[in-house]
Amino acid sequence: MLTSGNILLAGSLLSPEPGLIFWTTITFVLVLIILKKIAWGPIISALEEREKGIQSSIDRAHGAKEESEAILRQNRELLAKADAEADRVIREGREYAEKIRAEITEKAHQESQKMISAAKEEIEQEKRRALAELRNEVADLAVRGAEKIIRGVLDADVQKKVVDSMIQDLSTNRN
């Protein structure tokens, strides 16, 4: 209906009528009862099941987190142990190398001392042999000189010549 440019709606849903309110309330209650009997149980059980699934996922996530933290701690401990072991091995290696170096140095020192001692002994033996040889030659020269002196009377010039000749003989025999 149209009056003076306004539209009036008769029997509109927005106008409160007692019959409409009554039937709407009854329909609402019936729908609630039907939903409670038919759909409410499955919806609630689905929500509970979903809640259990979410809780289970959360529990598994917490368990996985704790497990990963335990593994991380264990890995850190193993890494610390490995570092300590590596440090120990390096330290022992250095100590062993130092010990070997000291032993080699000591052996080299002992060998050099042996060689020096052997060389000194050899020099001493050569010196003794040379002195013995020199004594023998001097004794031979003295005997020969005495022989020549005994054979004849010598004057100073002759004695000088004899001594010079013995020295020359000595130097020729040594070479």
UniProtKB/Swiss-Prot annotation:
Pfam families, alphabetized: ATP-synt_B
Gene3D superfamilies noted in UniProt: F1F0 ATP synthase subunit B, membrane domain
GO CC field: plasma membrane; proton-transporting ATP synthase complex
One GO MF term attached to the UniProt entry: proton-transporting ATP synthase activity, rotational mechanism
Membrane topology reported for the UniProt record: Single-pass membrane protein
Subunit structure: F-type ATPases have 2 components, F(1) - the catalytic core - and F(0) - the membrane proton channel. F(1) has five subunits: alpha(3), beta(3), gamma(1), delta(1), epsilon(1). F(0) has four main subunits: a(1), b(2) and c(10-14). The alpha and beta chains form an alternating ring which encloses part of the gamma chain. F(1) is attached to F(0) by a central stalk formed by the gamma and epsilon chains, while a peripheral stalk is formed by the delta and b chains.
NCBIfam families tied to this protein: ATP_synt_b, PRK14472.1
Keywords for this protein: ATP synthesis, Cell inner membrane, Cell membrane, CF(0), Hydrogen ion transport, Ion transport, Membrane, Transmembrane, Transmembrane helix, Transport
Keyword Cell membrane: yes
Protein name stated in the entry: ATP synthase subunit b 2
Stored CDD domains: ATP-synt_Fo_b
Function comment: F(1)F(0) ATP synthase produces ATP from ADP in the presence of a proton or sodium gradient. F-type ATPases consist of two structural domains, F(1) containing the extramembraneous catalytic core and F(0) containing the membrane proton channel, linked together by a central stalk and a peripheral stalk. During catalysis, ATP synthesis in the catalytic domain of F(1) is coupled via a rotary mechanism of the central stalk subunits to proton translocation.
Cellular localisation: Cell inner membrane
Highest taxon in the source lineage: Bacteria
Regions that span the bilayer: 20-40
PANTHER family in the cross-refs: ATP SYNTHASE SUBUNIT B, ATP SYNTHASE SUBUNIT B', CHLOROPLASTIC
SUPFAM superfamilies: F1F0 ATP synthase subunit B, membrane domain
Family to which the UniProt record says this protein belongs: Belongs to the ATPase B chain family.
